Amino acid sequence: KEVGGHARHPLERYVVIEELLAAGAPGGAHWIADRQTAPLILRYGSEEAKAAYLPGICKGEIHTCIGLSEPGAGSDLAAVRTSARHTPEGWRISGQKIWTSGAHMSHVMLALVRSEEGSERNAGLSQFLIPMDAPGITIRPIIDMGGDHHFNEVFFDDVLLPEWAMVGTRGQGWAQATAELALERSGPERYLSSHVLMTALIDAA
């Protein structure tokens, strides 16, 4: 409530999303923000991050995306090469993400990056909140076979972030990311959105 929400139970969110989808409402842009990013910020985020992002997420004004997959790594999330380098000014992010859903419509990316030089696999990873309008970010669309634009490549060229942009504990990004991903299938969005589309196709046939 202190950041503009209603402190309601997750099952109540489930019911609201169910009704929105049943009515065909366009709620997809906000799913990641309220379902995954906000709970992670509440649990692990700095006070500055909570103040910067949670009120806007509660109002539906801030949309987020998740920066996980990278080129050449397939579905191996432990193969992250995008780096976070600590400097006197803050953190410098360099690298690339791919297959990022909705990056072109998002205000913030929650990214899993390698913060410890020389670390391997799931060790030495941290999570950062990256404003998508920050200098040094380039977004390139990936157009699917149907001509739609949903996925993106995102490039980071020495993107500067403040200290508070790190979410949680340095080097504990893997544990935090797996906890966050447990929320990804916590709602009815996937199957109900498909059901609405299937019904529309049947009606149009």
Where are these regions (language model features)?
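A short core secondary-structure module
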Residues: 94-140
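Internal helix-loop-helix
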Residues: 1-51, 55-60, 101-108, 194
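Residue-level signal for inorganic ion chemistry
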Residues: 46, 128, 156
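Glycine-rich beta->alpha junctions and the first turn(s) of the following alpha-helix
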Residues: 22, 136-205
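Short Gly/Pro-enriched turn/cap motifs at secondary-structure boundaries
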Residues: 30, 57, 72-75, 99-102, ...
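Short Ser/Thr-interspersed hydrophobic loop/turn segments at strand-loop and sheet-helix junctions
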Residues: 16-21, 112-113, 130-135, 158-161
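A short, Trp-centered hydrophobic/proline-enriched beta-strand micro-motif
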Residues: 60-68, 112
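A structural signal for short hydrophobic beta-strand segments in well-ordered beta-sheet cores
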Residues: 82-85
